[in-house]
Amino acid sequence: MACFLNCVRFDVSKTITDKPTSQGSGVTCYNSWDDVETLTSNFSRLIGSGGYSSIYMARFSGSDKAALKVHVSSHRLYQVFRLELDILLRLQHPNIVKLLGYFDDSEENGALLLEYLPQGNLQEKLQSNSKQVLQWRNRVAIALQLVQAIEHIHEKCSPQIVHGDIKSSNVLLDKNFDCKLCDFGSAKVGFSSMVQPPTMSPRSRQVKMVGSPGYTDPHYLRTGIASKKMDMYGFGVVVLELVSGKEAFSAERGEMLVHIAAPLMNEILDSSVDISEDKVRQFLDPRLLRDSLDIDEVKTMLSVAAVCISSKLSLRPSAAQVADTLIKEIPSLSFLGCGKGV
């Protein structure tokens, strides 16, 4: 029987005073917009933006850098802010972005103060023309850290969480290129899957769809079922980006990476076919060819991607299964000291 997933609302207590107050978790609640303006020096430095929010450089505790995410003011988007706030207040994991503070006027305005990650996001790092190329050992470590973050929200939170928008631009990198999953505004909280009510019109269903071009699970687009399998599909696309260095979706060329990779993915899923080293190297990011990397590690990454983006949901592994596979089959990770996360 299909289970309906309802976004669970959590009570976030807030003491109203004229000064910022500290939650028991160490998260600071800012009680006036003046506090927010002070944190950002009156919003003097914009460092990022999305469809529904802008991100400003901020100073936390007077000196430490932080990132302030300000949501567009509207009642509907305030609900998105509340969802993300409620989730981040519950999450503590080394590979999930840390919430430092927040402002909530309980009506239409909201802001999240997040840890600052100096290396930006994974998409920017992979697509950058900089001479500083993200090395293979960093790429496999990012894959493991990301899937451990997904495993945490899928299996180790109560209630469980489906992120809903796993993509490389939602993977932030710290100074050591360790990754942090961010942006929980599209998350679903509760059971592992949901089915849209059968009485919902196609137009209404379309409005509720989440995801990003190149990353959205085709099964979700067809059925409206948001599940852990959807997150694993997005993870599989990110792995393809890590291996190939290509973007998930090129608006200029109208190409999706999953379509480019489809012939190779089909060969990998056909257990009777032994993929040649030449085919693997043709798909590999050419900036990595001079590295002395183990081609079997590349094959492992591609095999993981293939099962994660499979059209057969039964073939898609859990995050825990992928983490185990990477740890067992990619020797580079043992040298980096990567292991099972919290």
Swiss-Prot record:
It catalyses: L-seryl-[protein] + ATP = O-phospho-L-seryl-[protein] + ADP + H(+); L-threonyl-[protein] + ATP = O-phospho-L-threonyl-[protein] + ADP + H(+). The active site is at D165 (proton acceptor). ATP binds at I47, G48, S49, G50, G51, Y52, S53, S54, I55, K69. The keyword ATP-binding applies. SMART domains: S_TKc. GO terms for molecular function: ATP binding; protein serine kinase activity; protein serine/threonine kinase activity. The modification Phosphotyrosine is found at Y220. It is an enzyme of class 2 (transferase). Keywords: ATP-binding, Kinase, Nucleotide-binding, Phosphoprotein, Serine/threonine-protein kinase, Transferase. GO terms for biological process: response to wounding. The modification Phosphoserine is found at S169, S201. Belongs to the protein kinase superfamily. Ser/Thr protein kinase family. This is Probable receptor-like protein kinase At4g10390. It comes from Arabidopsis thaliana (Mouse-ear cress).
